[in-house]
A protein has these predicted regions:
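Binuclear metal-ion centers of metallo-dependent hydrolases, dominated by the metallo-beta-lactamase
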Residues: 219-240
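Conserved Radical SAM active-site core
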Residues: 23-104, 108-121
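Hydrophobic alpha-helical packing residues
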Residues: 49-52, 88, 158, 226, ...
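Short, acidic Gly/Pro/Ser/Thr-rich loop/turn segments
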Residues: 12-16, 31, 134, 171
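N-terminal pre-triad scaffold of radical SAM enzymes
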Residues: 1-27, 66-69
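Conserved AdoMet/S-adenosylmethionine-binding subsite of the radical SAM
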Residues: 77-204, 209-216
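Amphipathic alpha-helical segments in well-structured domains
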Residues: 42, 85, 186, 219, ...
Length: 240
């Protein structure tokens, strides 16, 4: 789920992701991520960001407070993600040192050494984990390949620098009951969060149209009930 984070640097309307989440506003996956597809080149991204930052700060006197990697899919699928992150940090330091760099990631590529390193360099690595068990992970996220245990262990290894992002929902998909708010599921998820000990947690629910129609949106008062259980662990938690 990608919420609006400001003006877009490079527009790409095609979804390219290692998940096919039942709640994703971008719809079901239509591109096979196991094959090579044309992506924006590192040097083109750097040029576009240079143009944007130099124009915004010099000509329009705009204060930039955030640079965000998001888009319609998983940004860490880019083979040059480490170099791109290093370029962004270089330009940020030059033109808007006050700005925080954020990435929204589904955590699947933390198994790649270059991705793990790249995300460690970022101010706000927002890393997703929507389930407490392998079964619910497969039902909600419909992953291409990455195993739940791999994601869990890499998030624990990543530790307190990350911000954990989780979408809570209930519903039905393909005849299966979906519910990551049940006592069993939420307790399992909570134990993982405890082991990660993140900087903070973001709990949110469905905001836009979803590809699977039989899903229930949780309202803020209910999200707050779950947030209180996370706060009881001493972890800052926000609801959206």
């Amino acid at each position: 789920n990608r919420r609006n984070c400001g003006s877009e640097l490079i527009t790409n309307r095609k979804k390219y992701c290692s998940f096919s989440c039942i709640y994703c506003e971008c719809g079901w996956n239509k591109i096979d991520t196991s094959i090579q597809v044309p992506l924006n080149k590192r040097e083109d991204i750097k040029k576009a960001l240079y143009k944007k930052l130099s124009e915004s700060t010099k000509e329009f006197n705009t204060t930039i407070d955030s640079i965000t990697f998001s888009g319609n899919g998983e940004p860490t699928l880019h083979p040059d993600i480490l170099g791109i992150v290093e370029d962004v940090i270089e330009l940020r330091n030059q033109y808007c040192p006050q700005a925080k760099i954020t990435i929204l990631s589904n955590s699947t590529n933390l198994v790649r050494e270059d991705v793990f390193k790249a995300l460690q360099l970022i101010d706000n690595p927002i890393l997703k984990i929507d389930a407490g068990t392998e079964r619910m992970y497969k039902l909600i996220n419909e992953p291409v390949s990455c195993k739940f245990e791999q994601i869990k262990q890499k998030l624990i290894e990543f530790g307190s620098k990350c911000i954990v992002q989780t979408l809570l929902l209930r519903g039905e998909c393909k005849g299966e009951r979906i519910d990551n708010t049940s006592e069993e599921e939420f307790t399992a998820w909570l134990e993982i969060v405890k082991q990660i000990s993140p900087k903070s947690v973001m709990l949110y629910s469905i905001d836009r149209e979803t590809p699977e129609k039989n899903l229930e949106k949780l309202l803020i008062p209910e999200l707050e009930q779950y947030a209180e259980r996370v706060r009881a662990l001493g972890i800052e938690t926000n609801t959206y």
